[in-house]
Amino acid sequence: MLRRYTYNEIIKKSHKRCSNYGIKIDIPCPSKILRDEEFNVIIQKNKALIEIARPFMEILYNFLKGSGFSLYFTEKNGVVLTIIGDQDIIRDQIQMGIIEGADMSEKSAGTNGIGTAFAENISLQISGEEHFIKVFQIWTCSSSVVHDEDGNIIGCLNLTGRRQLAHPHTLGLVVAAVKSIENHLKVKKTQNELVKTYQYLNKITDSVNLGIFAVDTKGIIKAINKSACDMLHINEEDVINKNVDTVLDSWKHILQRLRNGQSYEDEEIMYSDKKKRFNINVYPIKDKNSNITGMVGIFKDIQNVYNLVNKYINRTAKYTFDDIIGQSEAMKRLKEQIKSISNSPSTVLIQGESGTGKELIAQSIHNNSNRRSKSFVAINCGAIPKSLIESELFGYEEGAFTGAKRGGCPGKFELANEGTLFLDEIGEMPLDMQVNLLRVLQEGCITRIGGNKCVDVDVRIIAATNKNLKKEIEDGNFREDLYYRLSVIPIYVPPLRERNGDIGILIEHFLKIKADKLGKLIPEIRKNIYENLLSYGWPGNVRELENCIENIVNMNGNTSFNFENRTIKKDVNCYSDVSLEYDMCSLEELEKRAISICINQCGGNISKACRILGINRSTLYIKIKKYNIKVR
């Protein structure tokens, strides 16, 4: 409020307040001066305000230096925070207790420029006898209250000199200085809000698993988030205000696309000087006239995209060690072996007849390894035409051949990066492709068809075959060097005829699974059918047994499976010569009879019976006791 208040009504109101406060007119100084510890607390609370006000006080004092004035700045309750002025004036004021820490409110110092300006919430000038306390009547005080953006009183600026120096212009100087302080406070608040907003945005962009950067129209990087720096293995200070093409060598192409009004979304790019690919989207920043003023790029590691794709198209391993059914010594040794090598990065070659469960073993290895959270990608080398297997394994770039997809396509190696690649029927791979596969295994990187850049891949290779690869090498169908590269860890999966003791367990397992699948009750199997199940040679191994059990469940315990017209390989573990009477029985009864038959066949030799049944001696004795089986 720009008025010079010297009217008696203002002074009278103030004097009346002072009388009511009980202030004596003859006191030598303000009645309240803060102790050091109290004052230090006040200073800390108003530190930011002092830092803003002090420069304006110094500017104003430079105009008045040597003219007999001093400047005071107080906090919202009238406590003096800082003083600037001519030394002789300050010296006299110190004698009167007008010092830093003095309370200049009306309750402490009577009617004065600071206290009365606070009381009336106005700018005013008080001179001479207008002061309530006599000792202060030698001064003229021009004061203006400082408000924050919301109109709250936060301080006061006061200019004091000898009473004979009173002039209305001095109040104008103070008011102008206060306006400058208030404007600066607004600017500071806006700056703080901008900084806070920037910090919020930084926190948001740093918390997402996406690389984000912003560039101007010249391609100069103006901002980049932490995720981008981590993915590119760079420091923010090394790239800020640098050209983006030092990081992304395809930037000129991106910029041209955007300037031509084309979009640049879900594209695949290569990181400069690195064998790494990213999926990127770039969006233009436009002004109100639709002119491009900059661009924002958002990218992610292409491997994360591949992992997500693999997850949703079920390129994951579902089998674990719990799915490997069997208690025979051969299966126990197999389980121990694959558990011990699961975390090794070395290549694995699984060999075994068709239907023995080679992929089950491969998936179990993956799910027991430190790669279990990554992709398990399988490819059947014998099911893909020779002309396509290279692109399936290594991928291709856009335009590599007629019909190639726009943007190219990753191969199985890239899709399996950081995970496991299962090469089933490796023995069927063409010789020329074996050379390419060997090179990838040796160098750890792939080059897409039509491309010229090598992309690093970290893939655990598990290969499988039902062929005798050593014979294939002799016949010239398989490379010897590839064989040794693949068979760092050889695994042999025994056929079912070598683990007859597991047949009963597998029958029970598949009965439960197939009954659940078909929505049926577990059927009772006729004894003669069960005898055939135990004695049959199972050339198709576990897969053939599984299909046979599904047939039995469908037919409620009977079967259309013709054992006689199939090739049956008999050995010591076959029980086809044993005659069982034709009636119905439970699984427990079947187990009892199977154990009894086995013991009789072995002439009462418990050790031999244990080997055939695939169980240990203590387990067999428990079952002998349970079923009250007589041993000869």
Swiss-Prot record:
Residues 324-554 form the Sigma-54 factor interaction domain. SUPFAM superfamilies: Homeodomain-like, P-loop containing nucleoside triphosphate hydrolases, PYP-like sensor domain (PAS domain). InterPro entries: AAA+_ATPase, GAF, GAF-like_dom_sf, Homeodomain-like_sf, HTH_Fis, P-loop_NTPase, PAS, PAS-like_dom_sf. Keywords: ATP-binding, DNA-binding, Nucleotide-binding, Transcription, Transcription regulation, Two-component regulatory system. This is Signal-transduction and transcriptional-control protein. The keyword ATP-binding applies. GO terms for molecular function: ATP binding; ATP hydrolysis activity; sequence-specific DNA binding. ATP binds at residues 352-359, 416-425. The keyword Cell inner membrane does not apply. Residues 606-625 bind DNA. It comes from Clostridium beijerinckii (Clostridium MP). GO terms for biological process: phosphorelay signal transduction system; regulation of DNA-templated transcription. It comes from the Bacteria. Residues 197-270 form the PAS domain.
